[in-house]
Amino acid sequence: MNSVGEECTDMKRDYDQCFNRWFAEKFLKGAGSGDPCTELFRRYRECVQKAIKDKDIPVDGVDFMGPSKSKTESDGSS
């Protein structure tokens, strides 16, 4: 599948290959302490964010996944 930005498609492919290789060869075998693809993901995410902005795609109300976001809805306080 191509990326939202044509200029990001190669980065997406590189990240997908890196992640799939790490997942199959390390994580599923219990040797997955850390994701070696973090930098590829960061560059791809930045490219996608730029493409969304450049194409003026509305994203209001959309939750984005990523290491900088965390859900605190169920923090145990009532």
From Swiss-Prot:
The record marks F27, F41 as: Important for interaction with prelid3a. Disulfide bonds join C8-C47, C18-C37. A motif (Cx9C motif 2) lies at residues 37-47. This is TP53-regulated inhibitor of apoptosis 1-A. InterPro entries: MDM35_apoptosis (IPR007918). Its main location: mitochondrion. One of its GO terms (biological process) is pronephros development. Keywords: Apoptosis, Coiled coil, Developmental protein, Disulfide bond, Lipid transport, Mitochondrion, Transport. Belongs to the TRIAP1/MDM35 family. The gene is triap1-a.
